[in-house]
């Protein structure tokens, strides 16, 4: 083992930083814990927000774990693993990012104690993996046997939004909008849910209580020409993926003109080509045109003359939503325009908000896209509202599509911890200690919840366990200035099961990955 | 540093910045550098091996247990150390696994060589001895190896599991081993002479983050990470005719810059019409071929996209070249590089499914003579799946080589101890100082069980002694169970390695050690970093040709 001691020989490039053995483990674990520590105060209905200021002075105020970690400018490589965990959580299920990060941190903290007790890292890894398996079983058992009606989904959305800065609207109004939005577009003909169909658009001004659900698409666009109608009802819609402009050939072409007549002919030809677009659209009975590319000013004029409302440079994602809302096809050419290529909507109207005009496209024939139009006093308010709503949409979808719901408020975690402890006794070898440590780590979630609510964490935990023992269900319900132990289902605190599963999975994988490292080699 | 110049007034014949290290100093320098490399990876060896976290200058993080990945990412700046890294790379290319073992053995060989050098044994004698031993060791591996039936799935799974233990893929090794063995069996064909040929070109690995590793799956077919070019295209086909196209569906342009002068709008119109007609014609050719799905390696013009969508054809543009090649195997289609000469015969058949959440296409071949499977690996984060992929790739190589080679060995240090004991017997028959080198070689091989024990927190000497005793009793398969610390039949315990990887490890470790030993002079134009050029290192391989014949002497052992 002890190699011959000599002058150390450097085989690595100069400036390379290397730590190994216990010090590498310590440094990684400390970094992981520090990250978890940073977000834990945001957990739960009484969690607080963070204000993050970036290097250019931009301010973000948020309660959302993934956003905090992303903006925190974290450099330590192991800490980045935790950021990744919260990002995966965000991408997969859209919520529970703080939970995942806190759980990873707790798992690392307990791993540190186990390493002190001389448990080999691979044993800890085995134990944690085993415990995660038990946890998944426990989650299975906790899945509530209820029908996912609107009422229940609203509770799920509400649970996700509590503690976030949802402005002066109480969460229940927003939850109603969210659930309705998701239900309206939930499944298309193939039985597939497209998350993009629920769109969120924000606009400052008014108060957040002015938030509304638009059954269609809201575009941040103005008509290309002032003379176009500002509102059209019962309209035929075309969505174009082509330029309404003079066509140019792929080869460079150049007029070589010797007489005035030739010039006139060229100008006339262009003119009639441009008129042709407006005519083709008017003939097809189109009332509103959404174009993802440019529209020549002259064409805009002709369209206005024909009484057609047109928008140019519409974003691809907007065009997609418009197509899904109105049933229109996206056209790359007008030459073979057919009635079936066009869509229909009840109304298109331009509404002014401050200096901006927004186009509301409502009541589409296909009705496959809806927009949550969020209002709020300031930029920061709507931004945070948007994050909360996006998360709420995700959890509602997760509840419908990914296996149902479990009680929230720490109740599921208590059940997991209890199950792991009782099964731990049957596990042979040192692994058992790691399995038990996992139970402790999971309990850190209700503990943090209690702490943030203003309860004594130890008392709360003991009460929770006792109540779970007798009634099989116990969570932390915030009330007044503190909290109490209660039945979360009765009080409507419900989480999608997918969020819990993903948090357990990704926290375990990240923590075990970090525990296995005994050597960190960082290039300059 | 001990780069002392020769005493006396030096005669300077080199550039001012040049550095020169000679004789014992050079040997010492080289050996230490090589050992430092070996030292860096040895803690990753075995089921209780640990991982390394590597951070590059951009701040990108790699977490791995894979020897060759560690060495590649380590930013090594020393000419000798880089030669050792090459050992790992060769091992990876040839055998796909056992890179850590190869490097660790190379380091140990050099350590033992150092002792021999101290006893005034000339490097050429050591090299000859190492060569003899390596030759002999490979013969013995073939002798010890057990022939297996390539259809024995249980055994193949054990081989895959052994390769994965100690890596993060271990946590789901039953599932993954099953997937790997099934994948390899899908692409194995029996040649006329009864040997098995595995074409790993037909196994592709795709990774996806989200969900856990236990939800990884094996798909018969390809996973194409692309979107349709147009939203209105159909994306699900039970039975589609697939066209693979290596020609842009765009207006043809000359390579030379052309500039057309026209005089009237009619002329312009003709150009425009002609261009449109050209696109239309290309689309018509695709339609006429009967294709439902087009994977194009090049671009597709916007207007052509529109026409294709109208015809209800699914088109994907800028498909990766490797994907096209894979699709060719799966669908049985030929790649069309000129639409003018398209025939129905070149189309392949496949079912196409769309995974909206993952934005992927699953393409599955229809028919008997289609080969091609995709291992879809999942893990919670990028780093998890990356490491999973490395582990699975290695296991895949190992299983493939087992099927092709048909020989396996007991792992857990069993083979190394057995080899060492046989080499020691053989050493007695070697005359001259080479005998000592052969013995040193035997000692070096025993590094593997020693490190296995060390990484598991066991006493390495006790373990080694127990193992030696067991092998003395004729228990060829006796290996170390690192979980219990007991010596047991490794084969029965499911620790099975391929003979091919072991042979390669022995061979490349010896050659690298010999290469380093032969050097007695390092001349660097600048300082001794690899920013400058390498020194001389050409001599060693040539010296080995003559040694082959002698190895045969002890063959009947």
From Swiss-Prot, chain A:
Name of the featured protein: Thermosome subunit 3
Organism: Haloferax volcanii (strain ATCC 29605 / DSM 3757 / JCM 8879 / NBRC 14742 / NCIMB 2012 / VKM B-1768 / DS2) (Halobacterium volcanii)
Protein induction: By heat shock (at protein level).
Subunit structure: The thermosome or CCT complex is a oligomeric complex of two octameric double-ring structures; the complex is probably a heterooligomer of CCT1, CCT2 and CCT3 with yet unknown stoichiometry.
Gene name of the encoded protein: cct3
Pfam families tied to this protein: Cpn60_TCP1 (PF00118)
CDD domains per the UniProt record, alphabetical: cpn60
Ranges in coiled-coil conformation: none
Taxonomic lineage from the root: Archaea, Methanobacteriati, Methanobacteriota, Stenosarchaea group, Halobacteria
Matches recorded under NCBIfam families: thermosome_alpha, thermosome_arch, thermosome_beta
Additional note from the record: Cannot be stably overexpressed.
Curated annotation (Swiss-Prot), chain B:
Any one GO MF annotation of this record: ATP hydrolysis activity
Disulphide bond pairs: none
InterPro entries, per the entry: Chaperone_TCP-1, Chaperonin_TCP-1_CS, Cpn60/GroEL/TCP-1, GroEL-like_apical_dom_sf, GROEL-like_equatorial_sf, TCP-1-like_intermed_sf, TCP-1_chaperonin, thermosome_alpha
Factors inducing expression: By heat shock (at protein level).
Family of the protein in this entry: Belongs to the TCP-1 chaperonin family.
NCBIfam families reported in the protein's UniProt record: thermosome_alpha, thermosome_arch, thermosome_beta
Transmembrane regions: none
Record-linked Pfam families: Cpn60_TCP1
Protein's name in the database: Thermosome subunit 2
Region annotation Disordered: where it falls in the sequence: 527-557
Keyword terms: ATP-binding, Chaperone, Nucleotide-binding, Stress response
Function: Molecular chaperone that assists in the folding or refolding of nascent or denatured proteins along with ATP hydrolysis. ATPase activity is highest in thermosome assemblies containing CCT1:CCT2, followed by assemblies containing CCT1:CCT2:CCT3. Seems to contribute to thermosome ATPase activity. Not required for growth.
Oligomer status and interactors: The thermosome or CCT complex is a oligomeric complex of two octameric double-ring structures; the complex is probably a heterooligomer of CCT1, CCT2 and CCT3 with yet unknown stoichiometry.
Classification via CDD domains: cpn60 (cd03343)
């Amino acid at each position: 083992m002890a190699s011959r001691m000599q002058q150390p020989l450097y085989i690595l490039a100069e400036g390379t930083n290397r730590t190994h053995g216990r010090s590498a483990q310590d440094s990684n674990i400390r970094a992981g814990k520090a990250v978890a520590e940073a977000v834990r105060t945001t957990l739960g209905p009484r969690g607080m927000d963070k204000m993050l200021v970036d290097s250019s002075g931009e301010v973000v105020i948020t309660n959302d774990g993934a956003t905090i970690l992303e903006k925190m400018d974290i450099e330590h490589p192991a800490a980045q693993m935790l950021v990744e965990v919260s990002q995966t959580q965000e991408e997969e299920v859209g919520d529970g990012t703080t939970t995942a990060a806190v759980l990873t941190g707790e798992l690392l903290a307990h791993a540190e104690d186990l390493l002190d007790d001389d448990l080999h890292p691979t044993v800890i890894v085995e134990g944690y993996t085993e415990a995660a398996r038990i946890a998944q079983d426990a989650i299975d058992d906790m899945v509530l046997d209820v029908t996912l009606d609107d009422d229940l989904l609203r509770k799920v959305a509400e649970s996700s939004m509590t503690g976030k800065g949802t402005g002066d609207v109480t969460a229940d109004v927003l939850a109603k909008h969210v659930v309705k939005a998701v239900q309206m577009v939930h499944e298309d003909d193939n039985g597939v849910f497209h998350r993009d169909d629920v769109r969120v658009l924000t606009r400052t001004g008014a108060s957040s209580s002015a938030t509304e659900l638009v059954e269609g698409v809201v575009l941040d666009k103005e008509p290309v020409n002032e003379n176009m109608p500002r509102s059209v009802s019962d309209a035929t819609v075309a969505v174009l993926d082509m330029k309404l402009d003079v066509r140019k050939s792929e080869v460079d072409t150049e007029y070589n003109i010797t007489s005035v007549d030739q010039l006139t002919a060229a100008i006339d030809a262009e003119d009639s080509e441009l008129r042709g677009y407006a005519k083709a659209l008017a003939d097809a009975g189109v009332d509103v045109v959404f174009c993802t590319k440019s529209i020549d000013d002259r064409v805009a004029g002709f369209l206005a003359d024909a009484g057609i409302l047109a928008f140019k440079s519409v974003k691809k994602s907007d065009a997609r939503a418009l197509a899904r809302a109105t049933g229109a096809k996206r056209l790359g050419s007008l030459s073979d325009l057919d009635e079936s290529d066009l869509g229909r909507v009840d109304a298109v109207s331009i509404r002014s908000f401050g200096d901006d005009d927004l186009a509301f496209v409502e009541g589409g024939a296909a009705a496959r896209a809806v927009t949550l139009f969020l209002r709020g006093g300031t930029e920061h308010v709507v931004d945070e509202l948007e994050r909360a709503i996006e998360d709420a949409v995700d959890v509602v979808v997760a509840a419908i599509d990914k296996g149902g719901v479990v009680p929230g408020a720490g109740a599921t975690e208590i059940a997991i911890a209890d199950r792991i402890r009782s099964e731990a006794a049957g596990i042979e070898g040192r692994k058992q200690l790691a399995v038990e440590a996992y139970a402790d780590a999971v309990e850190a979630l209700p503990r943090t919840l209690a702490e943030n609510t203003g309860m004594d964490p130890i008392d709360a935990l003991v009460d929770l366990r006792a109540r779970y023992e007798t009634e099989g269900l116990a969570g932390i319900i915030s009330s007044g200035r503190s909290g109490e132990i209660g039945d979360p289902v009765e009080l409507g605190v419900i989480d999608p099961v997918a969020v819990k599963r993903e948090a357990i999975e990704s926290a375990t994988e990240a923590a075990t990955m970090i525990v296995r490292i005994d050597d960190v080699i960082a290039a300059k | 540093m001990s780069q002392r110049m020769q005493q006396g007034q030096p005669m300077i014949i080199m550039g001012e910045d040049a550095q020169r290290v000679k004789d014992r100093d050079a040997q010492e320098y080289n050996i230490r550098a090589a050992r430092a490399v070996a030292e860096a990876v040895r803690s990753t060896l075995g089921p209780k091996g640990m991982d390394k976290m590597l951070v590059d200058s951009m701040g990108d993080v790699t977490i791995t247990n894979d020897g060759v990945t560690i060495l590649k990412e380590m930013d090594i700046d020393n000419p000798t150390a880089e030669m050792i890294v090459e050992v790992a790379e060769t091992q990876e290319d040839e055998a796909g696994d056992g890179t850590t073992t190869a490097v660790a053995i190379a380091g140990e060989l050099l350590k033992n060589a150092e002792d021999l050098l101290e006893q005034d044994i000339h490097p050429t004698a050591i090299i000859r001895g190492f060569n003899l031993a390596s030759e002999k060791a490979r013969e013995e591996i073939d002798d010890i190896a057990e022939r297996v039936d390539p259809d024995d799935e249980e055994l193949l799974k054990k081989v895959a599991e052994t390769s994965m233990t100690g890596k993060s893929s271990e946590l789901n090794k039953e599932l993954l081993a099953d997937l790997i063995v099934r994948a390899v069996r899908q692409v194995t064909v029996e040649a006329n002479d009864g040997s098995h040929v595995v074409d790993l070109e037909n196994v592709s690995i795709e990774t996806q983050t989200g969900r856990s590793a236990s939800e990884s799956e094996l798909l018969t077919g390809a996973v194409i990470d692309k979107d349709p070019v147009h939203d209105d295209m159909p994306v699900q086909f039970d039975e589609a005719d697939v066209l693979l196209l290596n020609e842009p569906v765009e207006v043809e342009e000359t390579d030379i810059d052309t500039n057309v002068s026209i005089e009237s709008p009619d002329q312009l119109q003709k150009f425009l019409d002609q261009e449109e007609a050209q696109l239309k014609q290309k689309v018509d050719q695709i339609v006429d071929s009967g294709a439902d799905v087009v994977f194009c390696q090049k671009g597709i013009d916007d207007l052509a996209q529109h026409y294709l969508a109208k015809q209800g054809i699914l088109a994907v543009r800028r498909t990766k070249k490797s994907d096209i090649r894979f699709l060719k195997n799966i669908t049985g289609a030929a790649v069309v590089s000129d639409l003018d000469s398209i025939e129905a015969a070149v189309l392949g058949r496949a079912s196409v499914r769309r995974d909206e959440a993952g934005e992927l296409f699953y393409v599955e071949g229809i028919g008997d003579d289609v080969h091609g499977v995709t291992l879809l690996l999942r893990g919670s984060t990028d780093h998890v799946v990356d490491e999973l992929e490395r582990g699975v790739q290695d296991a895949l190589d190992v299983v493939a080589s087992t099927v092709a080679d048909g020989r396996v060995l007991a792992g857990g240090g069993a083979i190394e101890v057995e080899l060492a004991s046989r080499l020691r017997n053989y050493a007695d028959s070697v005359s001259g100082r080479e005998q000592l080198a052969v013995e040193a070689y035997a000692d070096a091989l025993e590094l593997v069980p020693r490190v296995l024990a060390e990484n598991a927190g066991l006493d390495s000497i006790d373990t080694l002694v127990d193992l030696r005793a067991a092998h003395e009793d004729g228990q060829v398969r006796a290996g170390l169970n690192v979980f219990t610390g007991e010596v047991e039949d490794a084969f029965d315990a499911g620790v099975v390695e391929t003979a091919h990887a072991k042979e390669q490890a022995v061979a490349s470790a010896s050659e690298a050690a010999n290469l380093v030993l032969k050097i007695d002079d390092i001349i660097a134009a600048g300082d001794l970093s690899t920013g400058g050029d390498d020194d001389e290192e050409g001599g060693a391989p040539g010296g080995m040709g003559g040694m082959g014949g002698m190895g045969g002497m002890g063959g009947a052992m």
